[in-house]
Protein backbone atom coordinates (compact mmCIF):
# COMPACT_ATOMS: atom_id res chain seq x y z
CA UNK A 1 0.00 0.00 0.00
CA UNK A 2 1.17 3.52 -0.74
CA UNK A 3 2.37 5.16 2.51
CA UNK A 4 0.21 8.23 1.89
CA UNK A 5 -2.86 5.99 1.56
CA UNK A 6 -1.79 4.22 4.75
CA UNK A 7 -1.74 7.54 6.57
CA UNK A 8 -5.29 8.28 5.48
CA UNK A 9 -6.63 4.78 6.11
CA UNK A 10 -5.47 4.64 9.73
CA UNK A 11 -6.58 8.11 10.70
CA UNK A 12 -8.72 8.01 13.80
CA UNK A 13 -7.32 4.70 15.07
CA UNK A 14 -6.91 4.91 18.89
CA UNK A 15 -3.37 5.61 20.04
CA UNK A 16 -1.44 2.63 21.35
CA UNK A 17 0.46 2.79 24.61
CA UNK A 18 4.18 2.29 25.02
CA UNK A 19 3.62 1.29 28.63
CA UNK A 20 4.62 -2.34 28.00
CA UNK A 21 8.11 -1.26 26.87
CA UNK A 22 10.69 -1.13 29.65
CA UNK A 23 13.46 0.83 27.93
CA UNK A 24 13.52 3.22 24.96
CA UNK A 25 16.86 4.07 23.33
CA UNK A 26 17.38 6.49 20.45
CA UNK A 27 20.34 6.14 18.08
CA UNK A 28 21.48 9.51 16.72
CA UNK A 29 24.23 10.96 14.56
CA UNK A 30 24.93 14.46 13.36
CA UNK A 31 26.51 13.23 10.15
CA UNK A 32 25.31 10.84 7.46
CA UNK A 33 27.48 7.88 6.54
CA UNK A 34 28.80 7.16 10.04
CA UNK A 35 27.12 3.75 10.23
CA UNK A 36 24.28 4.69 12.53
CA UNK A 37 21.87 2.10 11.14
CA UNK A 38 24.62 -0.51 11.42
CA UNK A 39 25.00 0.42 15.09
CA UNK A 40 21.24 0.16 15.59
CA UNK A 41 21.17 -3.25 13.92
CA UNK A 42 24.07 -4.63 15.94
CA UNK A 43 22.69 -3.19 19.17
CA UNK A 44 19.40 -4.98 18.50
CA UNK A 45 21.15 -8.26 17.64
CA UNK A 46 23.31 -8.01 20.76
CA UNK A 47 20.39 -7.33 23.08
CA UNK A 48 18.45 -10.17 21.48
CA UNK A 49 21.47 -12.45 21.93
CA UNK A 50 21.45 -11.47 25.60
CA UNK A 51 17.89 -12.80 25.81
CA UNK A 52 15.97 -9.53 25.68
CA UNK A 53 12.81 -8.84 23.68
CA UNK A 54 13.65 -6.03 21.27
CA UNK A 55 11.70 -3.80 18.90
CA UNK A 56 13.32 -1.54 16.31
CA UNK A 57 11.59 1.55 14.92
CA UNK A 58 13.11 3.10 11.80
CA UNK A 59 12.16 6.79 11.47
CA UNK A 60 14.68 7.54 8.74
CA UNK A 61 11.73 8.13 6.45
CA UNK A 62 13.60 9.14 3.30
CA UNK A 63 16.28 6.47 3.60
CA UNK A 64 14.89 3.42 5.43
CA UNK A 65 17.63 0.78 5.42
CA UNK A 66 16.76 -1.44 8.38
CA UNK A 67 14.49 -3.85 6.46
CA UNK A 68 17.49 -4.80 4.32
CA UNK A 69 19.86 -4.92 7.29
CA UNK A 70 17.63 -7.49 8.99
CA UNK A 71 16.96 -9.43 5.78
CA UNK A 72 13.20 -8.78 5.81
CA UNK A 73 12.94 -6.22 3.01
CA UNK A 74 10.29 -8.25 1.17
CA UNK A 75 7.86 -8.13 4.11
CA UNK A 76 4.80 -5.90 4.42
CA UNK A 77 3.20 -4.43 7.51
CA UNK A 78 -0.49 -5.12 7.97
CA UNK A 79 -3.03 -3.51 10.24
CA UNK A 80 -4.87 -5.71 12.71
CA UNK A 81 -7.76 -4.74 14.94
CA UNK A 82 -5.17 -3.70 17.53
CA UNK A 83 -3.01 -1.60 15.18
CA UNK A 84 0.03 -2.04 12.96
CA UNK A 85 1.88 -5.30 13.53
CA UNK A 86 5.72 -5.19 13.53
CA UNK A 87 7.63 -7.52 11.21
CA UNK A 88 9.27 -10.34 13.21
CA UNK A 89 12.87 -11.42 12.70
CA UNK A 90 13.60 -15.12 13.22
CA UNK A 91 15.67 -15.67 16.38
CA UNK A 92 15.31 -19.42 17.00
CA UNK A 93 14.54 -19.23 20.69
CA UNK A 94 16.55 -16.13 21.53
CA UNK A 95 14.77 -12.97 22.61
CA UNK A 96 11.97 -11.61 20.45
CA UNK A 97 13.03 -9.23 17.65
CA UNK A 98 10.68 -7.17 15.48
CA UNK A 99 10.96 -4.15 13.19
CA UNK A 100 8.78 -1.29 11.93
CA UNK A 101 9.92 0.88 9.02
CA UNK A 102 8.42 3.00 6.30
CA UNK A 103 10.39 0.74 3.96
CA UNK A 104 7.72 -1.93 4.49
CA UNK A 105 5.05 0.42 3.13
CA UNK A 106 6.84 1.43 -0.07
CA UNK A 107 6.07 -0.24 -3.38
CA UNK A 108 9.73 -0.94 -4.13
CA UNK A 109 13.21 -0.11 -2.85
CA UNK A 110 13.55 2.58 -5.50
CA UNK A 111 10.42 4.47 -4.40
CA UNK A 112 11.35 7.93 -3.20
CA UNK A 113 9.67 9.64 -0.25
CA UNK A 114 9.24 13.36 -0.98
CA UNK A 115 7.42 14.70 2.05
CA UNK A 116 7.34 18.03 3.82
CA UNK A 117 7.60 18.33 7.59
CA UNK A 118 3.90 17.97 8.52
CA UNK A 119 3.56 14.65 6.68
CA UNK A 120 6.74 13.32 8.30
CA UNK A 121 5.38 14.35 11.69
CA UNK A 122 2.09 12.53 11.02
CA UNK A 123 3.93 9.36 10.01
CA UNK A 124 6.11 9.37 13.12
CA UNK A 125 3.09 10.05 15.32
CA UNK A 126 1.40 7.01 13.84
CA UNK A 127 4.45 4.84 14.35
CA UNK A 128 4.57 5.85 18.01
CA UNK A 129 0.85 5.58 18.76
CA UNK A 130 -0.51 2.91 16.43
CA UNK A 131 2.04 0.08 16.44
CA UNK A 132 1.23 -2.93 18.60
CA UNK A 133 4.65 -3.80 20.03
CA UNK A 134 3.48 -5.95 22.90
CA UNK A 135 5.83 -6.51 25.83
CA UNK A 136 9.39 -5.42 25.05
CA UNK A 137 12.52 -5.00 27.10
CA UNK A 138 13.95 -2.51 24.61
CA UNK A 139 12.68 -0.30 21.81
CA UNK A 140 15.48 1.10 19.63
CA UNK A 141 14.65 4.12 17.49
CA UNK A 142 16.89 4.65 14.48
CA UNK A 143 16.86 8.28 13.36
CA UNK A 144 18.08 10.09 10.24
CA UNK A 145 21.29 12.13 10.42
CA UNK A 146 21.15 15.73 11.59
CA UNK A 147 18.51 17.55 13.62
CA UNK A 148 15.51 17.71 11.31
CA UNK A 149 11.72 17.41 11.49
CA UNK A 150 11.99 13.74 12.42
CA UNK A 151 14.07 14.50 15.51
CA UNK A 152 11.78 17.26 16.71
CA UNK A 153 8.73 15.05 16.15
CA UNK A 154 10.13 12.03 17.97
CA UNK A 155 11.25 14.20 20.90
CA UNK A 156 7.73 15.62 21.19
CA UNK A 157 6.04 12.23 20.91
CA UNK A 158 8.27 10.69 23.59
CA UNK A 159 8.22 13.55 26.05
CA UNK A 160 5.75 11.76 28.35
CA UNK A 161 7.31 8.29 28.07
CA UNK A 162 10.61 9.13 29.78
CA UNK A 163 13.00 7.40 27.33
CA UNK A 164 16.28 6.11 28.74
CA UNK A 165 18.27 8.36 26.43
CA UNK A 166 20.34 8.53 23.27
CA UNK A 167 23.35 6.71 21.88
CA UNK A 168 25.29 9.15 19.70
CA UNK A 169 27.35 7.73 16.82
CA UNK A 170 30.35 9.36 15.19
CA UNK A 171 33.42 8.39 13.20
CA UNK A 172 36.93 9.52 14.19
CA UNK A 173 37.27 12.28 11.59
CA UNK A 174 36.84 15.91 12.53
CA UNK A 175 34.19 16.49 9.86
CA UNK A 176 31.96 13.94 11.64
CA UNK A 177 32.65 15.00 15.22
CA UNK A 178 31.90 18.63 14.32
CA UNK A 179 28.36 17.69 13.30
CA UNK A 180 27.90 15.40 16.29
CA UNK A 181 28.46 18.40 18.55
CA UNK A 182 25.23 19.82 17.12
CA UNK A 183 23.45 16.54 17.91
CA UNK A 184 24.63 16.66 21.51
CA UNK A 185 23.43 20.24 21.83
CA UNK A 186 20.07 19.20 20.35
CA UNK A 187 19.71 16.46 22.97
CA UNK A 188 20.36 18.95 25.71
CA UNK A 189 17.82 21.41 24.33
CA UNK A 190 15.07 18.78 24.32
CA UNK A 191 16.18 17.27 27.67
CA UNK A 192 17.14 13.93 26.15
CA UNK A 193 19.79 12.20 28.22
CA UNK A 194 22.94 11.17 26.36
CA UNK A 195 23.88 7.64 27.38
CA UNK A 196 27.17 7.85 25.55
CA UNK A 197 29.17 8.30 22.37
CA UNK A 198 30.27 5.45 20.08
CA UNK A 199 33.20 5.91 17.71
CA UNK A 200 32.30 3.78 14.70
CA UNK A 201 34.65 2.81 11.83
CA UNK A 202 37.55 3.06 14.25
CA UNK A 203 40.09 0.93 12.41
CA UNK A 204 39.80 -1.87 9.86
CA UNK A 205 39.88 -5.57 10.76
CA UNK A 206 41.90 -7.58 8.24
CA UNK A 207 39.72 -10.51 7.05
CA UNK A 208 42.79 -12.77 6.89
CA UNK A 209 44.87 -12.07 10.01
CA UNK A 210 42.25 -10.11 12.07
CA UNK A 211 44.78 -7.35 12.78
CA UNK A 212 43.10 -3.96 13.22
CA UNK A 213 44.63 -1.04 11.29
CA UNK A 214 43.67 2.61 11.80
CA UNK A 215 42.82 3.72 8.27
CA UNK A 216 41.24 6.94 9.53
CA UNK A 217 42.27 9.14 12.43
CA UNK A 218 41.55 7.78 15.90
CA UNK A 219 40.18 9.12 19.16
CA UNK A 220 37.75 11.74 17.85
CA UNK A 221 34.78 10.16 19.58
CA UNK A 222 36.52 9.85 22.93
CA UNK A 223 37.76 13.45 22.76
CA UNK A 224 34.24 14.60 21.94
CA UNK A 225 32.81 12.72 24.92
CA UNK A 226 35.36 14.33 27.22
CA UNK A 227 34.67 17.78 25.79
CA UNK A 228 30.94 17.51 26.51
CA UNK A 229 31.32 15.48 29.70
CA UNK A 230 29.27 12.53 28.44
CA UNK A 231 30.12 8.81 28.71
CA UNK A 232 32.33 7.22 26.07
CA UNK A 233 30.93 3.81 25.20
CA UNK A 234 33.72 2.48 23.01
CA UNK A 235 35.10 2.24 19.50
CA UNK A 236 34.00 -0.19 16.79
CA UNK A 237 36.22 -1.22 13.86
CA UNK A 238 35.13 -1.96 10.31
CA UNK A 239 34.85 -5.72 9.88
CA UNK A 240 34.28 -6.92 6.27
CA UNK A 241 32.86 -10.16 7.65
CA UNK A 242 29.93 -8.25 9.16
CA UNK A 243 29.24 -6.65 5.78
CA UNK A 244 29.31 -10.11 4.21
CA UNK A 245 26.94 -11.38 6.89
CA UNK A 246 24.37 -8.67 6.15
CA UNK A 247 24.65 -9.09 2.39
CA UNK A 248 24.51 -12.90 2.36
CA UNK A 249 22.55 -13.78 5.51
CA UNK A 250 19.80 -15.54 3.54
CA UNK A 251 22.34 -17.94 2.05
CA UNK A 252 23.84 -18.83 5.43
CA UNK A 253 22.70 -21.49 7.86
CA UNK A 254 21.28 -20.13 11.09
CA UNK A 255 19.41 -17.01 12.16
CA UNK A 256 20.94 -13.56 11.91
CA UNK A 257 21.23 -13.41 15.70
CA UNK A 258 23.06 -16.74 15.85
CA UNK A 259 25.40 -15.80 13.02
CA UNK A 260 26.14 -12.41 14.57
CA UNK A 261 27.07 -13.98 17.90
CA UNK A 262 30.01 -15.62 16.11
CA UNK A 263 31.32 -12.32 14.73
CA UNK A 264 34.29 -10.35 16.07
CA UNK A 265 32.03 -7.38 16.79
CA UNK A 266 29.62 -9.17 19.13
CA UNK A 267 31.95 -9.09 22.20
CA UNK A 268 32.57 -5.38 21.58
CA UNK A 269 28.86 -4.65 21.55
CA UNK A 270 28.32 -6.76 24.65
CA UNK A 271 30.67 -4.46 26.55
CA UNK A 272 29.02 -1.38 25.06
CA UNK A 273 25.56 -2.58 26.08
CA UNK A 274 26.74 -3.20 29.63
CA UNK A 275 27.85 0.44 29.75
CA UNK A 276 24.54 1.59 28.26
CA UNK A 277 22.61 -0.39 30.87
CA UNK A 278 24.77 1.04 33.62
CA UNK A 279 24.19 4.60 32.42
CA UNK A 280 20.45 4.14 31.91
CA UNK A 281 20.09 2.73 35.43
CA UNK A 282 21.38 5.98 36.93
CA UNK A 283 18.74 8.51 37.99
CA UNK A 284 18.28 11.32 35.49
CA UNK A 285 19.41 14.73 36.65
Curated annotation (Swiss-Prot):
Quaternary data: Heterotetramer of 2 NBP35 and 2 CFD1 chains.
Pfam families on file: ParA (PF10609)
Listed InterPro entries: Mrp-like_CS, Mrp/NBP35_ATP-bd, NUBP2/Cfd1_eukaryotes, P-loop_NTPase, YlxH/NBP35
Subcellular location: Cytoplasm
Homology family: Belongs to the Mrp/NBP35 ATP-binding proteins family. NUBP2/CFD1 subfamily.
One GO CC term, this protein: cytosol
PANTHER family: CYTOSOLIC FE-S CLUSTER ASSEMBLY FACTOR NUBP2, NUCLEOTIDE-BINDING PROTEIN NBP35 YEAST -RELATED
GO biological process, alphabetically ordered: iron-sulfur cluster assembly
CDD domains registered for this protein in UniProt: Mrp_NBP35
Residues reported in the UniProt entry to bind ATP: 30-37
Protein name, entry field: Cytosolic Fe-S cluster assembly factor CFD1
Binding residues annotated for [4Fe-4S] cluster, in chain numbering: 206, 209
Presence of the UniProt keyword Cell membrane in the record: no
Entry keywords, A to Z: 4Fe-4S, ATP-binding, Cytoplasm, Iron, Iron-sulfur, Metal-binding, Nucleotide-binding
Keyword Iron in record: yes
